[in-house]
């Protein structure tokens, strides 16, 4: 279940960042879209920047 939630956070953040821009999206917005409490995000990522770095690392590996 923990991995599923982390994947949902990742996918939702990627979608929101690409549609609205990183600076326009809050952790609260991501959590709301995922359907979890904002504090629950921090069980998976330390910050919004950590989510972004995870996304960037994923694509860096994908395009190698």
Task: Kindly label every feature range from the protein language model.
Residues 9, 30, 41:
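Conserved hydrophobic/aromatic packing and binding residues within compact polymer-binding modules
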Residues 16-25, 29, 45:
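Short helix/strand-capping hinge loops at secondary-structure junctions
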Residues 4-5, 36:
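The short coil/loop that forms the "turn" connecting the two helices of the helix-turn-helix
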Residues 8-15, 19, 33, 50-64:
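Alpha-helical structural segments
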Residues 35-45:
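Short hydrophobic/aromatic patch on the recognition helix
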